[in-house]
C-alpha cells in the first residue's frame, strides 16, 4: 500500500436504496472515481443463515488482469501476483483474492475490492474464461482438526457462508476507476468503512508484534 496522509477526505457521492419484499434492500453509491453497492437486511429474525451472494462483472472485451491466486480459501495472502488476460482465467483455474486490478485501456484501470467486512467471509473471485468473473465464498466451518504447527484444518463445513444478525448491513462491493496513479491514491475502502468504534485513537502507538516473523526475533 502507498502511505498517504489526509487532513480531510472528500466523501461526496450520489446514493440510491432499492427496497424489496422479504425484508431486504440494496444500496448503491456513485462517486467521482467509482461505484459501490451493498445488501441490507431488515428482517425480524435475530439470526439468519446466508446461503450465498452473487457478484458478477462482465467487461466489453478481453482485458489484462492482475490478481493473486491462492491454492484455496486458507491463505496467508503471500502468493506472487499473476498477470494475464481474462480469457486465460477459467472457472476451474485458481480463484483470486481481493483486490483485483483490470487494465481497461492504456490509461484507465478498474480496481475491484470490498469494504466494511464484519461477521462475514471474505469474497474471492473466479474467472469465466472470457471477459469477466464471479464471486465465490468459503462455507462456515463447523469442525476443526490439527494440521501441523499453529494451524487447523477444516473437517466439516456448513452449507451456508454466514450465520449473522438478521437485521444488518453487509460488506460493500466496489469498483474504483481511474489512471494507475489515481487508483493508488483512491480512498474508497476508507470512505465505505463504518466509523471507528473506539472513539479517540490518539493513545495508540506503534510497537512490537508478538510474532517472530514480524518483530525480528530469532527464537531458534
Segments the model singles out, each with a brief description of its role:
Residues 161-219:
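An acidic-aromatic substrate-binding cleft motif
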Residues 1-185:
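N-terminal accessory beta-strand-rich subdomains and adjacent acidic, glycine-rich linkers
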Amino acid at each position: 500500500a502507498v502511505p498517504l496522509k489526509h487532513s480531510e477526505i472528500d466523501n461526496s457521492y450520489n446514493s440510491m436504496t432499492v427496497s424489496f419484499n422479504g425484508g431486504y434492500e440494496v444500496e448503491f453509491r456513485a462517486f467521482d472515481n467509482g461505484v459501490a453497492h451493498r445488501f441490507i437486511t431488515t428482517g425480524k429474525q435475530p439470526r439468519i443463515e446466508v446461503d450465498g451472494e452473487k457478484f458478477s462483472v462482465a467487461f466489453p472485451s478481453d482485458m489484462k488482469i492482475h490478481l493473486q491466486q491462492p491454492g484455496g480459501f486458507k491463505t496467508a495472502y503471500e502468493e506472487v501476483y499473476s498477470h494475464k488476460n481474462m480469457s486465460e482465467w477459467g472457472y476451474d483455474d485458481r480463484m483470486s483474492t481481493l483486490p483485483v486490478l483490470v487494465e481497461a485501456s492504456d490509461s484507465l484501470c478498474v480496481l475491484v475490492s470490498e469494504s466494511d467486512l464484519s461477521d462475514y467471509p471474505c469474497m474471492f473471485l473466479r474467472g469465466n474464461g472470457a471477459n469477466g468473473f464471479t464471486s465465490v465464498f468459503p462455507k462456515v466451518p463447523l469442525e476443526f482438526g490439527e494440521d501441523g504447527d499453529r494451524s487447523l484444518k477444516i473437517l466439516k463445513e456448513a452449507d451456508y457462508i454466514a450465520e449473522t444478525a438478521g437485521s444488518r448491513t453487509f460488506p460493500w462491493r466496489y469498483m474504483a476507476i481511474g489512471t494507475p496513479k489515481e487508483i493508488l491514491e483512491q480512498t474508497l475502502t476508507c470512505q465505505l468503512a463504518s466509523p471507528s468504534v473506539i472513539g479517540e485513537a490518539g493513545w495508540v502507538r506503534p510497537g512490537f508484534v508478538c510474532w517472530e516473523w514480524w518483530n525480528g526475533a530469532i527464537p531458534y
